[in-house]
C-alpha cells in the first residue's frame, strides 16, 4: 500500500531542521505524498519559531500542484496537568495539533508522572496526535495511555525517526504501543518526524513495527487524505473543510 499522508514534519522555522515548505512540496511530488502537515516545534523550545509563525500559517496555500498542506504544530507537553505551549482561539486556527514530551521543556521524571501528564494531555481535547509516545526517556503505562487515547479519540504516533536518528531504544515500547492499540481500538498514525525533506513519507521502520504487532494497517490515518481529514473534522477542525473540497474536486 502507498501511504499518501505524513502528519509530522519540521521546516527551517525550527532551526535544527533543514528544509523549506518548497522543498517538502518537491519531495512530496516525487514520492506520491498527497498531503503533509507542517508541524514545527511549539514556542517553548529554545530554537522554535515565534508564536506569530503559527498564527500566520494561514498565508500558506491549501494545495500546490496537487499536494495539500496542513497547518499545524508539534506542541510541547509542559507539565503533569497536560498543558501545552499553544493556547486559546489560536489553536482553532490550526488544522492539526500534535504534542509530545521534549527534554528541554519537560525533563524526564518517573513513569507515573509521565503517564499522568500524557493522559491529561489526551483528555484536554486540545491535541489530535501524541508524538513519539514510545520514547524510552519517558516510560509510561502503555495500556493506560492506549485506553485513554481510544476513549478520547486521540491518535498515538509510531514515529519513524525514533528507529533511525533519535530516541534510540524505542522499538520495544513502540511494539507494545501498537499491540495495546490493537487491543483497545486506539487509532495509530505513522509520522516521519522529518527534519529534512528527503525523509518525508519515510515509514519503513514504523510499518515494520506495526506489522510485527499485528495492528490492522487498514486503520492507519496515513491511508489517504480523506481518512486523515475526516478524523480532523470529527475532532472539530472545521478549517479542513476547504482542503477536503479541493481533494473532492480532484477526484
Swiss-Prot record:
Disulfide bonds: none annotated. It comes from the Bacteria. One of its GO terms (biological process) is bacterial-type flagellum-dependent swarming motility. Zn(2+) 2 binds at residues 16, 41, 195. Its EC number is 3.1.3.-. Zn(2+) 3 binds at residues 74, 102, 132. It is an enzyme of class 3 (hydrolase). Keywords: Hydrolase, Metal-binding, Zinc. One of its GO terms (cellular component) is cytosol. It holds the Pfam family PHP. Zn(2+) 1 binds at residues 8, 10, 74, 193. Binds 3 Zn(2+) ions per subunit. Its cofactor is Zn(2+). SUPFAM superfamilies: PHP domain-like. GO terms for molecular function: phosphatase activity; zinc ion binding. Belongs to the PHP family. NCBIfam families: PRK09248.1 (NF006702). This is Probable phosphatase Sputcn32_1369.
Amino acid at each position: 500500500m502507498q501511504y499518501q499522508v505524513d502528519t509530522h514534519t519540521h521546516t527551517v522555522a525550527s532551526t535544527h531542521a533543514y528544509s523549506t515548505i518548497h522543498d517538502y512540496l518537491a519531495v512530496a511530488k516525487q514520492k506520491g505524498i498527497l498531503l503533509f502537515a507542517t508541524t514545527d516545534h511549539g514556542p517553548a523550545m529554545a530554537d522554535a519559531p515565534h508564536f506569530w509563525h503559527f498564527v500566520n500559517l494561514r498565508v500558506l496555500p491549501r494545495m500546490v500542484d496537487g499536494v495539500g498542506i496542513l497547518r499545524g504544530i508539534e506542541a510541547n507537553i509542559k507539565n503533569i496537568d497536560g498543558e501545552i505551549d499553544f493556547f486559546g482561539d489560536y489553536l482553532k486556527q490550526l488544522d492539526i495539533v500534535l504534542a509530545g514530551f521534549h527534554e528541554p521543556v519537560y525533563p524526564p521524571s518517573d513513569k507515573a508522572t509521565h503517564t499522568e501528564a500524557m493522559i491529561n494531555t489526551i483528555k484536554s481535547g486540545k491535541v489530535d496526535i501524541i508524538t513519539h509516545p514510545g520514547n524510552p526517556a519517558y516510560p509510561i503505562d502503555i495500556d493506560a495511555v492506549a485506553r485513554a487515547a481510544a476513549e478520547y479519540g486521540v491518535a498515538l504516533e509510531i514515529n519513524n525517526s525514533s528507529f533511525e536518528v533519535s530516541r534510540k531504544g524505542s522499538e520495544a515500547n513502540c511494539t507494545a504501543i501498537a499491540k495495546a492499540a490493537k487491543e483497545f481500538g486506539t487509532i495509530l498514525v505513522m509520522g516521519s518526524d522529518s527534519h529534512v525533506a528527503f525523509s518525508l513519507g519515510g515509514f519503513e521502520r514504523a510499518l515494520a513495527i506495526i506489522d510485527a504487532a499485528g495492528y490492522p494497517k487498514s486503520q492507519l490515518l496515513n491511508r489517504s487524505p480523506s481518512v486523515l481529514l475526516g478524523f480532523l473534522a470529527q475532532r472539530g477542525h472545521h478549517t479542513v473543510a476547504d482542503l477536503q473540497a479541493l481533494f473532492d474536486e480532484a477526484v
